[in-house]
A protein has these predicted regions:
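A short, polar/proline- and glycine-enriched secondary-structure boundary/capping micro-motif
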Residues: 34-36, 86-87, 116-120, 152-153
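Short, surface-exposed secondary-structure junctions/capping segments
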Residues: 24-30, 120-131
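Short, compositionally stereotyped local motifs that mark structural "simplifiers"
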Residues: 1-53, 57-60
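Aromatic, loop-rich ligand-recognition surfaces of beta-strand-rich domains
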Residues: 44-108, 124-170
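Solvent-exposed serine/threonine-rich low-complexity stretches and specific carbohydrate-binding patches
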Residues: 106-117
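Residues that form or immediately flank small-molecule/cofactor binding pockets and catalytic motifs
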Residues: 27, 100, 111-112
């Protein structure tokens, strides 16, 4: 019919973890695979687009091989909050670093406050900042999931999901 559509655009964000080898220590839900964790494409607020990896029974835990020892000033990740789809924000995170990929030392641990039920669907960025910067080749990240939906939720028998998109290392 001669009509054209708008060009498709996708912004790619590069960081030290982008497209680096990643080893999952916990498996995501089969419907929400983990290819999106460090592909440089930021997930949208609609989790079904495929840019999100989802966990329902385990915390997310992964090791990224940066390829060589790098300076690390920040490790960050995006989490999705969508109470309507029983997706909750991360409950906390831990970061470890290693030079050999076998012996890790913990450099960060934080628990996050629960966001009140009914909050607007959104993407939340969580950051672990290091000053002075660290040096390591391997970064291990564990993102803890909420174990139960809020008391006000319409069906507390459902198990909440944790959806993670990009893992960033700067």
């Amino acid at each position: 019919d001669g009509r054209r559509s708008e060009p498709f655009r996708e912004e790619v964000t590069f960081n030290k973890a982008t497209m680096k080898p990643i080893r999952l220590l916990t498996a995501p839900h089969p419907k929400y695979a983990a290819a999106a964790l460090n592909d440089g494409l930021r997930g949208k607020r609609v989790f079904t687009y495929g840019n999100w990896a989802g966990w329902q029974d385990d915390d997310m835990e992964a090791v990224i091989d940066l390829g060589r020892q790098e300076e690390i000033a920040q490790v960050a990740f995006n989490a999705l909050l969508d109470y309507g789809s029983h997706i909750m924000d991360a409950a906390g995170a831990k970061v470890w670093v290693s030079d050999d990929g076998e012996t890790f030392r913990e450099v960060y641990g934080e628990h996050y406050p629960e966001i009140p039920y009914g909050a607007v669907k959104r993407i939340l960025r969580h950051e672990a900042n290091f000053s002075p910067a660290l040096r390591a080749r391997y970064v291990k990240l564990r993102v803890m999931r909420s174990k139960q939906l809020p008391e006000a939720y319409f069906d507390r028998n459902l198990r909440p999901f944790l959806f993670i998109d990009e893992i960033y290392v700067y």
